[in-house]
């Protein structure tokens, strides 16, 4: 199968945990079923560069990180069980700000 191409975006400080890169275009193995749960594991192993505890908590995103898939709240799409589709855009927004 062809690669699964998706776009990851990080904003409002989430990019600081990923090498200060706000947008990444990924080509994932198309022979594998990619859910958000699988994607988070891949991100943790491959691109999460700073303080993973600020992004992942017990195999999901920690409270305070909003996740939008194609501009739709992931809670409406099944959260971790959502199966990624070709050209999906996954946006992570941090609401955790220091004072």
UniProtKB/Swiss-Prot annotation:
Keywords: Cytoplasm, Isopeptide bond, tRNA processing, Ubl conjugation pathway. SUPFAM superfamilies: MoaD/ThiS. One of its GO terms (biological process) is tRNA thio-modification. It holds the Pfam family Urm1. GO terms for cellular component: cytosol. Pathway: tRNA modification; 5-methoxycarbonylmethyl-2-thiouridine-tRNA biosynthesis. InterPro entries: Beta-grasp_dom_sf, Mopterin_synth/thiamin_S_b, Urm1. It is found in: Cytoplasm. The modification 1-thioglycine is found at residue 99. Coiled coil: none annotated. C-terminal thiocarboxylation occurs in 2 steps, it is first acyl-adenylated (-COAMP) via the hesA/moeB/thiF part of the MOCS3 homolog, then thiocarboxylated (-COSH) via the rhodanese domain of the MOCS3 homolog. Acts as a sulfur carrier required for 2-thiolation of mcm(5)S(2)U at tRNA wobble positions of cytosolic tRNA(Lys), tRNA(Glu) and tRNA(Gln). Serves as sulfur donor in tRNA 2-thiolation reaction by being thiocarboxylated (-COSH) at its C-terminus by MOCS3. The sulfur is then transferred to tRNA to form 2-thiolation of mcm(5)S(2)U. Also acts as a ubiquitin-like protein (UBL) that is covalently conjugated via an isopeptide bond to lysine residues of target proteins such as Prx2/Jafrac1, Ciao1, Eip71CD and GILT1. Interacts with cer. Belongs to the URM1 family. PANTHER family: RURM1 PROTEIN (PTHR14986). This is Ubiquitin-related modifier 1 homolog. The gene is Urm1.
